[in-house]
Amino acid sequence: MMRFDKSGSVQDVLLAAIFLFGFAIAFLITHNVMTRTVEEMLTTTTINESEPTVKALGGITETLTRLDALIFAVLVAFILGIIITGFLVGGHPIFMFIYFIVIILSVVISTVLANTWETATATAQLTSSLTAFPITNFIMLKLPIFVTIIGFIGIVVMFGKPYVFGGEQ
């Protein structure tokens, strides 16, 4: 007889949206700061004199362009995590209403996060870095839609399996 912790899954959708927003903002700012730093280093003649230095700085720039794909990977990881925890955490169908209310609150909060993303990326400092993040920009602008879809997938997975009294399934 295996017992799992019965917490989780309801708030996971909201936490995923908040963490995704945090990662997106952090990566965008990191890209902006590091790109400006590398450009400044490349224009300084005492730093960019050797070929290995130029290659190393080019490697930093190449790594920064991969941060966009990392946000997509984080989104996929959160989706898979919510599906897995929804399957492993048993839920009585009577609690579906509470889960639905939490999804609605998560969509409202994710709308605020999407609007905050749009406002933050409209600043002159971050606009140049935004062109390197097309996937992240799409995900963040459509975050309420993603949260809705992920939330309903969580409902189907958590409450769609047969319920057996006593917590055993």
Regions found by a protein language model. Give the residues of each.
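Long, compositionally biased, intrinsically disordered regions
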Residues: 15-169
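Glycine-centered recognition micro-motifs in short, flexible terminal segments and loops
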Residues: 1-19
